[in-house]
UniProtKB/Swiss-Prot annotation:
Any Gene Ontology biological process: methylation
Presence of keyword Methyltransferase: yes
Record-given protein name: Ribosomal protein L11 methyltransferase
Physiological role: Methylates ribosomal protein L11.
C-alpha cells in the first residue's frame, strides 16, 4: 500500500454534507471524514452522551468540511474534475454549498488512518441507541442498546440529523412482531438499529454494491441473523409487505418512490422518510398526501426534516 495519499478537502455547509459525501462515493474514494460544526453544538448540549471526544474538534467554527482520501493514480484528476463540477452544481438542486471550496493536500498513510477515524466517537442518538465505532471502547449503561459500526466507504455513521431522527422514529414505532424495509441502507445503520429495537425481520436494499458489502459486514459485527441485505431497488428485489418502510435519502427520490412504496406497506403501516431539506418539506408532504398517506409526525432538526406517515 502506498505511504502517501491525496486528501481532497471540500469546505461547505452542514446542509450539503450528505450530498457531498455522495459525490465522493461516486468516485474512487478510499475513506471519508466529516467535520460538522453542528455536531459540536450537539456535543455541547449533550455532554453526557459521549464516552470519548477529540477536544480539537471544538475549534471547528462555522464551516463544515468533508475530506476524501485517494491514491495518486491516473484517474485522480478525472475524479477531482467531477468533484469540483458536482459541488459547483449543488445550488441547482436547492442545496447551499457554502464556500464550495475544493483543496487537495498530500498526507501520510498513518495521518489518513487517524484522520478519518478520530471523528467517529460513541454517540447516543436516541433514548436507547448508542452508535459505537468498532475501534472504540464504551461503557454500556443498563438501558442502552449498542450498534457496532464501521462505515468504511458506505454512507451512514449515525452522527447526521437525518439518521438520528430516523432512529428515534424507529424506536417509537417498532414492536416485536414488526417487519422493516430499509431503502438505501448504506452502512446498514438503520437496518441494524431496527433489528436491535426488536423488529422480527429486516430487509435492507441499496443500489451500491459497496454499501451492500458494508451493511453485511456491520451486521456480522452486531451478531444479527434476522437482517437480509439485497442489491438493487425495492420494486425489483423485494417481495411482500412491511409494517415500516424507512428511507433516509433525498426529497426528490422520496417523491419519486412514494407511489411505489405504498404497495410494500401493510395496512396501518408507517413510512419514515428523511434526508429531506427543510425547503422541500411541503413538496414531500403534498406528494405523500396525494398518494393516500396520512401525516402522523414531522420531526425537524437543524435544516433537516423527517416525516412519519401512515397508511390507513
Amino acid at each position: 500500500m502506498d505511504k502517501e495519499w491525496l486528501e481532497v478537502c471540500i469546505y461547505t455547509s452542514s446542509e450539503a454534507l450528505e450530498a457531498i459525501s455522495g459525490i465522493l462515493y461516486n468516485t474512487g474514494v478510499k475513506g471519508v471524514s466529516i467535520e460538522d460544526p453542528k455536531d459540536i453544538e450537539f456535543k455541547k448540549k449533550h455532554p453526557g452522551d459521549w464516552d470519548y471526544f477529540d477536544e480539537t474538534l471544538l475549534k471547528v467554527k462555522d464551516t463544515a468540511i468533508v475530506k476524501g482520501y485517494y491514491k495518486e493514480d491516473d484517474k485522480f484528476n478525472e475524479y477531482l474534475d467531477y468533484i469540483k463540477k458536482s459541488v459547483s452544481n449543488l445550488d441547482q438542486f436547492g442545496i447551499d454549498k457554502g464556500k464550495g471550496l475544493v483543496e487537495v493536500h498530500k498526507v501520510n498513510e498513518e495521518d489518513w488512518e487517524n484522520n478519518w477515524k478520530k471523528y467517529y466517537k460513541p454517540t447516543k442518538v436516541s433514548n436507547k441507541i448508542v452508535i459505537k465505532p468498532i475501534w472504540e471502547n464504551y461503557d454500556k449503561k443498563q438501558e442502552e442498546i449498542i450498534v457496532e459500526l464501521d462505515p468504511g466507504m458506505a454512507f451512514g455513521t449515525g452522527t447526521h440529523e437525518t439518521t438520528r431522527m430516523c432512529i428515534n422514529a424507529l424506536e417509537k414505532h417498532i414492536k416485536e412482531d414488526r417487519t422493516v424495509f430499509d431503502i438505501g441502507c448504506g452502512s446498514g445503520i438503520l437496518s441494524i438499529a431496527a433489528a436491535k429495537l426488536g423488529a422480527k425481520h429486516v430487509i435492507g436494499v441499496d443500489l451500491d454494491p459497496v454499501a451492500v458489502k458494508s451493511s453485511k459486514e456491520n451486521i456480522k459485527y452486531n451478531n444479527l441473523d434476522n437482517i437480509e441485505i439485497l442489491e438493487g431497488n425495492l420494486m425489483e428485489v423485494v417481495e411482500g409487505r412491511a409494517n415500516i418502510v424507512v428511507a433516509n435519502i433525498i426529497a426528490d427520490v422520496i417523491i419519486f418512490l412514494t407511489e411505489g412504496v405504498k404497495a410494500f406497506i401493510e395496512k396501518d403501516g408507517y413510512f419514515i422518510a428523511s434526508g429531506i431539506i427543510n425547503s422541500r418539506k411541503e413538496d414531500v408532504i403534498k406528494k405523500l398526501e396525494e398518494t393516500g398517506f396520512v401525516i402522523e409526525e414531522v420531526r425537524e432538526e437543524g435544516e433537516w426534516v423527517c416525516i412519519v406517515s401512515k397508511i390507513n
